[in-house]
Amino acid sequence: MSSKRLSQNEQEKSPGTGPPTHKRRRIGLACNACRMRKSRCDGHRPSCSSCLSLGVNCLYEPGDSTTNVIVRKDYVSDLEQRVASVEHNLQRLNDVLKGHLSPCTGGTDSNNHHNNHDSPCHQPTIAQSITSSRPNTRDKSAANETCATGLEEPDDEDANTNGMAMTFVEEKTSVYYGEASNINFTQLLLRALATVHGATPVAPSASNQASGPGDGVTTDVPQNQHAVSASDLATSESSPTALPSVQEMDSLLDIYFDTAGVVFPFICEDTMRRTYNECRHNGFTRARRTWLGTLNMIFALASCLSSSAKVRFERCNVFYKRAMALCGELSKRVVSLEIVHYLILVVLHCQGTQRSIQAWNNHGLAIRSAMALGLHCQSSGVSLDSAQQEYRRRTWVIIYCLDKVLSTAFGRPASIADEQMHSFNGRESVMGLSPMSLSNPQVPVDLPGDFLSVSFRLYQVMSKSLAEQYGTNLDHVDSGHDDMAPLKASGELRKQLRLWAGSLPGHLHVCQPEDEFLAHNTRGNRLRVILTLRYHNLGILIHKPLLSTTIRHLFQAGNRMEAPPSYMIQLAMAEAHECLRSAQLTIDIVYAVISADPTPENNLGAWYFTLYYVFTASLVVSGRLLWAQHGQSIVDEVAVDHCKSLLSKAEEIFKKLDRKNSLVLSCLEYIARLARICSMKDVPPNHQNGSLDITSDTTNTASGVTDTMPLDEDGMDAFQLFAAEMFDPNIFKGFNLSPVEGVSFTDGIWEGFPCGG
């Protein structure tokens, strides 16, 4: 009894001496586990502390006798916030999609689905259905393919996925072609033809304001021709990381580094093959996304040089789409040397496909990415080894060369000024070996380095021509106060061009059409032919202003053949023959090579660069044909026959270059029609009120592929419009016959017009 009293006294004293205890908080509902254990439950949601410590499921189920459950206020507040957030997101999504989904409500019947496959409302359905079924549509050849996994993603804090699917209306892109472009020169020829035949030039539309000499041409390019279709999705592989078989990859790498890798040596072959072998040995389980995109673009370029046209374009398109899926958006956010290499390869690829606008846009992105890396400043890579510095320099030099090529082809201002290239003028800055390698036979010659070095100096002359003769493709106005200025500029640039040709090393000398080595396919011979074609193409560019001046003078409206030309015009006429000479040598050299070996393994290199050179030369010959036929009171029969002979060779070149290529065939058709209308001798008797019908003229064309080329009631106006908007496929509707037998032309044929080399 005494012990119990002592314990009670201690308990009564303890509250006064110890810290005060907290009052136990009652909860309205305990979880099932705590009720079964009859232990204390703190009521935390979604799991109480006891269940968390024991690792059991915590469930709150009110009993049958429970009528009033007490829920914590913070839990209810959290639920209210989550519901409000969901409602807010749903309202935003409803506002965004309200305007896009409303036009699609009336076209849900089965007939519309079958008849309107190209409509904006139908495309998302196709894309979603095919995308969901693509893993099951791969062909049997995919069994031999490899799929890269474990891609190393570059750090990008802005890479957030936008999950909304939208349907956009059709848009058109207005593109400008300045004075240096082939399209602008063609406009001059057609204005002269309109003067000869008395046709009234078509009134320029909103998209074409080329009314005066030297003006640019602005055309509208419809963009729906490259929209995603069912066939495109079906031909593309299920994953952008898919790769062909090892044997095919090895073959494509060999083709690239033996062809395009020699002409554009900005990717180190040893480094690329070393990385490729490492990825191949680990089964491509770990690879950089940028490197894999660059590899696919290498495969695309190599596939473009294969023998079969059908296989070439199918495989090339597959590799291009994979590369775009890997690096298309990434190239706009990440800057690295591999991204710059990827963009250069995209530019080269787009020049040979129906993506000329993408070539120009990606080229601008490549320049800015290269400048962000400091490739334009040689001091930025002083901490790197000599090989890395060399390929950084080569990358920037190739970007400079492409800048001048595209500026000439599109007639637009160049992006890289010559002042930014002073530190690259030295020969050793773009060569991998010492200059002594040329004189010492014991030292192997760096053929790609030599070729890039001399090409760089050639394009510097081209840059001077663009600045002095074309006003850098800005609003160039002829210097009326000095009639000798064009002659002086042409003579000085021709002198520089010949000095460049005289300074070439022995293994890269300019070749002639009668040289026997043109039939022997070697890497050195191929580079000599390519360099010679570039040389004569620049000769055309230098002397084309004088040819344009001659044509402009001879075919002035109301002032034709009334008085002898002035002394300055006579000098311009004499110098204009140099333009024809360069065009003739271009056609003769290509004709000699392709006659000896019409396969892609000949000495011409990439077919689309050859196409550009021959097409440019054919336009010049057509201008000389117009001059000889209609520019004087007496027809120059010798010159007419000579021009027809050259155009006949050009036709054979187009046919042997690639018979199944729509881009080549479109060039053949265009030159055939232009030669046909330039060689017409008399104005047809049924020409009335500015309308020209040339069906009554049965004169053969210069190339012999057309007997008649009937136009509709618009006559000459339709043909002039055809050249003014070369990229619009609807212009073909103005002609009743195609001068190429057995050829059907499809939409989008002009969007990929040859754009330089």
Curated annotation (Swiss-Prot):
Chain segments carrying region Disordered: 1-24, 106-161, 202-222
One GO location term (cellular component): nucleus
GO molecular function, one term: zinc ion binding
Keyword Metal-binding: yes
Keyword terms, alphabetized: DNA-binding, Metal-binding, Nucleus, Transcription, Transcription regulation, Zinc
UniProt feature, compositional bias: Polar residues: 125-135
Stretches with biased composition (Basic and acidic residues): 111-120
Subcellular location: Nucleus
Disruption phenotype: Reduces significantly the induction of the FBD cluster genes in response to 6-methoxy-2-benzoxazolinone (MBOA) treatment. Impairs the degradation of MBOA but does not affect the degradation of BOA and 2-aminophenol (2-AP).
Induction: Expression is induced in response to 2-benzoxasolinone (BOA) exposure. Expression is also induced in response to 6-methoxy-2-benzoxazolinone (MBOA) and 2-aminophenol (2-AP) treatment.
Gene Ontology biological process terms from the UniProt entry: DNA-templated transcription; positive regulation of transcription from RNA polymerase II promoter by galactose
Source organism, top-level taxon: Eukaryota
SUPFAM superfamilies: Zn2/Cys6 DNA-binding domain
Principal location class: nucleus
Cited SMART domains: Fungal_trans, GAL4
Residue ranges flagged as DNA-binding region: 31-58
PANTHER family: REGULATORY PROTEIN GAL4
General function of this protein: Transcription factor; part of the Fusarium detoxification of benzoxazolinone cluster involved in the degradation of benzoxazolinones produced by the host plant. Maize, wheat, and rye produce the 2 benzoxazinone phytoanticipins 2,4-dihy-droxy-7-methoxy-1,4-benzoxazin-3-one (DIMBOA) and 2,4-dihydroxy-1,4-benzoxazin-3-one (DIBOA) that, due to their inherent instability once released, spontaneously degrade to the more stable corresponding benzoxazolinones, 6-methoxy-2-benzoxazolinone (MBOA) and 2-benzoxazolinone (BOA), respectively.
Full protein name: Transcription factor FBD3
Organism this protein belongs to: Fusarium pseudograminearum (strain CS3096)
